[in-house]
Amino acid sequence: MADFLKGLPVYNKSNFSRFHADSVCKASNRRPSVYLPTREYPSEQIIVTEKTNILLRYLHQQWDKKNAAKKRDQEQVEAEGESSAPPRKVARTDSPDMPEDT
């Protein structure tokens, strides 16, 4: 292995002084780590990346959660008020089918 490194341009020759060819062989005998999935995903599944920024997406989610709570509280107040108040829509008294006198 020293013959292979001979002739290469280096600034500090001591960088290669501790190199031993035996250590390379021992390291290559190890089996590489392999990822084994725990779930089975369909092969036709398409992975799509989101175009929005992660920070913007997070802020929108927080804003939606905050507004959902406010909206829910407002709906409860309106529901309580509707039971005692008359309906907002009132039936029309004049019928559009009747011709007007001119």
From Swiss-Prot:
Give the sites modified to Phosphoserine. Answer: 33, 95
The answer, when asked if Acetylation is one of the entry's keywords, is: yes
Q: Which InterPro entries does the record associate with it?
A: DDA1-like (IPR033575), DDA1_dom (IPR018276)
Annotated region (Disordered), positions in chain: 67-102
Keyword Ubl conjugation listed: no
Domain of life of the organism encoding this protein: Eukaryota
GO BP annotation list:
protein polyubiquitination; regulation of proteasomal ubiquitin-dependent protein catabolic process
- Tell me where in this chain the PTM N-acetylalanine is found: 2
Q: Supply the Pfam families for this chain.
A: DDA1 (PF10172)
Subunit annotation: Component of numerous DCX (DDB1-CUL4-X-box) E3 ubiquitin-protein ligase complexes which consist of a core of DDB1, cullin-4 (CUL4A or CUL4B), DDA1 and RBX1. Component of the DCX(DCAF15) complex, also named CLR4(DCAF15) complex, composed of DCAF15, DDB1, cullin-4 (CUL4A or CUL4B), DDA1 and RBX1. Part of the DDD core complex containing DET1, DDA1 and DDB1; the DDD core complex recruits a specific UBE2E enzyme, such as UBE2E1, UBE2E2 UBE2E3, to form specific DDD-E2 complexes.
What's the stated role of this polypeptide? Answer: Functions as a component of numerous distinct DCX (DDB1-CUL4-X-box) E3 ubiquitin-protein ligase complexes which mediate the ubiquitination and subsequent proteasomal degradation of target proteins. In the DCX complexes, acts as a scaffolding subunit required to stabilize the complex.
The name this protein carries in UniProt is DET1- and DDB1-associated protein 1
User: What gene is it encoded by?
Assistant: Dda1
